[in-house]
């Protein structure tokens, strides 16, 4: 019978296709012998051994196809405790084991960022989580670093500077690095075997293959109460969950890059999967970051210069990661995120995630289609903008800054026009008569002081990309921002003013020709 509120005009809801279950008669599609234990796609049933080989091959192939990590380099593994990053750490751990067919040739370390203060966790819950994190990291044997997000309030302004590095570049350079690494290993083995000729076999084996855990692990203590209060005040002042998630991601990246530079890491691995990158691509399009998709979703991200972010898990889906972690008992830690228990329409990130996952349920090729589209994006600056190594970059995300004039028909032009129309009149904040007309220097000093008070927000806003400008609108005051952001903004503004003053005294090419 009829029910209140029932919509009869809409189309019938389409039920998702049933998940195929492997039968006893079905065999593995790879070896055609073993009994299948998982079904990745429709008809692709794998046994335990073949699924592990398939999973490991994806990870190794991604590193081999993009030869960004050179032998002997120090690589920092960004571990959040979740399934994807835990699986990434497990892949590196197995790739460095003695019985591995082709051992990985880089030196790993692990970093965990405690974001409990931004997510509203109590101190007791954070201490329990950190204790569990340390227990898992100690079992890996890698050097590990546990840092709190509150440490962003003690970062130097140099974090926001893109330090240039020499291009490692060609295939010949990679082969030469491999040869040097193998020669160093052979020389080290010969020295160890010669020095330990009279030692026991166990001691010689221990010196020949030293444990990664013997390096000192950087463990940060708990932050001060003032830093925790400052971080809580910063995130509580932001109006929307979308801006909170974007700022959290930005601060986390700045902290990880700083730790990598301090400890000599030149690469940072993140555990972003194919599913997560597909959601990120659509989310960034909605946030106005379409010009930076190649950096935000590509295999490597070189925006920080000397520290390169790489994504070796970008060929794995969340389904594959979940199956692998369950079958091989990969340890992980559950930590509530900033959007935990948030409704579907609370932020653009949550809305886009629900949209993509719902489409994936009805159309299983949704994630792969979006992901393959991101692979075709090329890291090229937009024509007519200064996006080279010496060009300006965004103060927060550090991507190339698109600079348009106020009268251009772009989003930047609309924002600039809106800012100019909403600015209060100069007479409202200044006296009717010149307050210091005794000398030119005094008048200039007074004018600069008034401009400093009135345009502090505009000084930072003009150094942001379009997406970061939109997010900063949800922050009523810029005072809660970390000091290194404000200091770098002031330094860039002063450099710009000095550069404009110097340009008045320089002779251009046109003037020289005339």
UniProtKB/Swiss-Prot annotation:
S-S bonds: none
Residues carrying Phosphoserine: 421, 425
Keyword Repeat: no
Modified residues (N-acetylcysteine): 2
Comp. bias regions, Basic and acidic residues: 12-23, 206-215
Pathway(s): tRNA modification; 5-methoxycarbonylmethyl-2-thiouridine-tRNA biosynthesis
Subcellular location: Cytoplasm
Sequence segments annotated as region (Disordered): 1-23, 192-222
Keyword 4Fe-4S in annotation: no
Main location: cytoplasm
Function according to Swiss-Prot or TrEMBL: Plays a central role in 2-thiolation of mcm(5)S(2)U at tRNA wobble positions of tRNA(Lys), tRNA(Glu) and tRNA(Gln). May act by forming a heterodimer with CTU1/ATPBD3 that ligates sulfur from thiocarboxylated URM1 onto the uridine of tRNAs at wobble position.
PANTHER family membership: CYTOPLASMIC TRNA 2-THIOLATION PROTEIN 2
The protein's name: Cytoplasmic tRNA 2-thiolation protein 2
Organism lineage: Eukaryota, Metazoa, Chordata, Craniata, Vertebrata
